[in-house]
């Protein structure tokens, strides 16, 4: 798919703004002017400034987590669901186009939000890359852009490179989506260790687990949707056959009932008195 010049210009302008903008969190200078204040007042002022900085840092961590949650935890998996739904709706050309463009839009939004989250992390947070969350996040960021570029520069249909491109795009997309979800869990754990807010981290873990469960359920459901439709057709045919069989059985039962009725209404034959000896001699 060829990306239009307007789309490229929008993305380049966004990235240029993000890289050239001032930091998201501007820390005030820590210089203290010594005047007639007492040492206790200076200590109180320093502690308040440290608390303010800590509060700003926590807000930056939360914003970073929300951006990456929406990007890799929601938009990217939903975009994968859209492209799979497009493959299922191959008989309807309109649905294929709608699902395909939804896939493209969701993936572009995911890349933009992940880029904002990465820049926020590099400019305002401590990035020593001494833990698994930061290392995995850096690798994911590189893989995500590689995946995006493979989606942009894809070969035309019928090309010899089409199969290799498809395998690369599919494998990268699957890995980035799964590892991105795992890294969100590691990010929640890192947030708990850094801020000691176990209540917030537990709530976020529960909410994210519920969301992932819903996405997995919908993925499995749409994957078996065609099978469910075929099973419903088979069941309808069986019900129709059973109804026809029951109808034929009812007709035969009515015939038998009519014959019995005819036997019942037959003209009775006149009977005569006889004894056992007469019957015995007739048999002999």
UniProtKB/Swiss-Prot annotation:
One of its GO terms (cellular component) is membrane. GO terms for molecular function: metal ion binding; transmembrane monodehydroascorbate reductase activity. It is found in: Membrane. Pfam families: Cytochrom_B561. Heme b 1 binds at residues 64, 133. Keywords: Electron transport, Heme, Iron, Membrane, Metal-binding, Signal, Transmembrane, Transmembrane helix, Transport. Residues 28-229 form the Cytochrome b561 domain. Residues 1-27 form the signal peptide. It is a multi-pass membrane protein. Binds 2 heme b groups non-covalently. The chain crosses the membrane at residues 63-83, 99-119, 136-156, 165-185, 201-221. Gene3D superfamilies: 1.20.120.1770. The keyword Signal applies. This is Cytochrome b561 domain-containing protein At4g18260. It comes from Arabidopsis thaliana (Mouse-ear cress). The lineage of its organism: Eukaryota, Viridiplantae, Streptophyta, Embryophyta, Tracheophyta.
